[in-house]
Amino acid sequence: MCSLAKSPSSDTSTIVRRSANYDPPIWSFDFIQSLPCKYKGEPYTSRSNKLKEEVKKMLVGMENSLVQLELIDTLQRLGISYHFENEIISILKKYFTNISTNKNPKYDLYATALEFRLLREYGYAVPQEIFNDFKDETGKFKASIKNDDIKGVLALYEASFYVKNGENILEEARVFTTEYLKRYVMMIDQNMILNDNMAILVRHALEMPLHWRTIRAEAKWFIEEYEKTQDKNGTLLEFAKLDFNMLQSIFQEDLKHVSRWWEHSKLGKNKMVYARDRLVEAFLWQVGIRFEPQFSHFRRISARIYALITIIDDIYDVYGTLEELELFTKAVERWDVKTVDELPDYMKLPFFTLFNTVNEMAYDVLEEHNFVSVEYLKNSWAELCRCYLEEAKWFYSGYKPTLKKYIENASLSIGGQVIFVYAFFSLTKSITNEALESLQEGHYAACRQGSLMLRLADDLGTSSDELKRGDILKSVQCYMHETGVSEDEAREHIKFLISEIWKEMNDEDEYNSIFSKEFVQACKNLGRMSLFMYQHGDGHASQDSHSRKRISDLIINPIPL
């Protein structure tokens, strides 16, 4: 049993420490435990199953290819396509076969772009040259497209974000469509064009493309917009609303479980006054990474991991002295409970909680997979703490890294690798040595890309506040210091890097990988969640109106039926 006796190094009375002045959490334990979880069991399950069968018949019985593609798109945006994964794959396979054998009908731009996007999303290698039919003799996209086909331009815009490295046609399509859609919005603002449903979709797309959006947030937004349309399908709408609420009830049960663990750990209760108590926000990340009902265990485990990352990150970033941080890093590397007595008092509870949580998770993996994972789990934490320590040394020495040097360390210190190791064991049915070695050595591109996107999105949303707290330079400031550009120019460069990461992410085929499809999707969804959480600032630490709305929309408040 771990002793919590006072250690020789625990006298901190003369140490002047930084403080981030984090606000206490607005979501109390009692509030979380009072969530009703209303939409579960009968009669909701029976009604959901009935609606699901009706939608399935609708989907597979369609003969018009464009209408069928539009239905798949609508199912995706309503957040219910996961119920029809097998049917959608079977349908799209036929469309891809037609393209491969030159039997595809002659589509207009809208239908071509829609088909292209859906096929790319499901891993089909549709060539970008399919859009050459919409170019003129000079190789430019035809000017006539813009005159009367806003729907087609918007579809091409969304399709262009599935671009991979070297795909110049899709690059040109993105520039072409973005410029036109921005002019279209400007004309709406000047009352030159009707501000209708299409205008709403265009504004939404320019804010962030569909491919980059997180599924549950998009479902909530689209359900509300779809309900306003005149040609809405009542069966689809009812099923989408009911499914959203039933999933939300599962999320509430998951959150209650995690909240009880947090309460028992005593890491809340205002004991960690120097760190962020953001359990609900930590859980929200997991909803975005894997929302499907069968992944409750993943959400419950990963929320713990994210909450612990937040606490330990703040110890390194804000509160600890360099000597104390070196002690904590060594304790994690040694992974011996006896080392807790060498730590300052304020570090003992976080270390003890980490130690117990990791070992508990290793037991779960052993029970499910008959695989001893503790070395992989604790090594991921040791690497994370070493990266934290490196940044602490930069801070205390006043070192200003280049952007490249910063990214090499910061893409690891953001905690993505820890998250992915736990996701791997939680989401993988059959563990292979090849996949495990690739993950352990950091070779898997989707993990690196997801972590880097998380880091850069975090920096865009939080760097100003973190600098005020006395943190190290972030990517924006590193680039400014290195090149002499303005902050606005530096931020644009970081946004450009994010778009480049997406090209690499698009190269990762989740349907043909040494990793499970569920794990690959989790890697990509971490990138999506990072853009979602930091879109309006620090969506993890801040408890502003944007943050409260995100949590209320996705976890707290059901959609009226």
From Swiss-Prot:
Q: Does the keyword Magnesium apply?
A: yes
User: Which EC class, in a word?
Assistant: lyase
Domain of life of the source: Eukaryota
Q: In which tissues is it expressed?
A: Expressed in glandular trichomes two to four weeks after flowering onset.
Q: What is this protein called?
A: (+)-alpha-pinene synthase TPS2FN
Q: Where does (2E)-geranyl diphosphate bind?
A: R276, D313, D317, R455, D458
| PANTHER family associated with the record | OS04G0344100 PROTEIN-RELATED (PTHR31225), TERPENE SYNTHASE 10 (PTHR31225:SF9)
| UniProt cross-references to CDD domains, sorted A to Z | Terpene_cyclase_plant_C1 (cd00684)
The answer to whether the entry has keyword NAD is no
Q: Which GO terms describe its biological process?
A: diterpenoid biosynthetic process
Keywords in alphabetical order, please: Lyase, Magnesium, Metal-binding
Pathway(s): Secondary metabolite biosynthesis; terpenoid biosynthesis; Terpene metabolism; (-)-alpha-pinene biosynthesis; (-)-alpha-pinene from geranyl diphosphate: step 1/1
Q: Tell me what reaction this enzyme catalyses.
A: (2E)-geranyl diphosphate = (1R,5R)-alpha-pinene + diphosphate; (2E)-geranyl diphosphate = (4S)-limonene + diphosphate; (2E)-geranyl diphosphate = sabinene + diphosphate; (2E)-geranyl diphosphate = beta-phellandrene + diphosphate
SUPFAM superfamilies according to UniProt: Terpenoid cyclases/Protein prenyltransferases, Terpenoid synthases
Any one Gene Ontology MF annotation carried by this entry is:
terpene synthase activity
Q: What is this protein's function per UniProt? A: Involved in monoterpene (C10) olefins biosynthesis, constituants of cannabinoids and terpenoids-rich resins. Catalyzes mainly the conversion of (2E)-geranyl diphosphate to (+)-alpha-pinene, and also produces minor products such as camphene, sabinene, beta-phellandrene, (-)-limonene and isoterpinolene.
**How the cofactor binds, per note?**
Binds 3 Mg(2+) or Mn(2+) ions per subunit.
Give the record's family classification.
Belongs to the terpene synthase family. Tpsb subfamily.
Pfam families on file: Terpene_synth, Terpene_synth_C
Give the lineage: Eukaryota, Viridiplantae, Streptophyta, Embryophyta, Tracheophyta
Binding locations of Mg(2+) 3? D458, T462, E466
Q: Where, in this chain's numbering, is Mg(2+) 2 bound? A: D313, D317
Comment block on domains: The Asp-Asp-Xaa-Xaa-Asp/Glu (DDXXD/E) motif is important for the catalytic activity, presumably through binding to Mg(2+).
Which positions are annotated as binding Mg(2+) 1? D313, D317
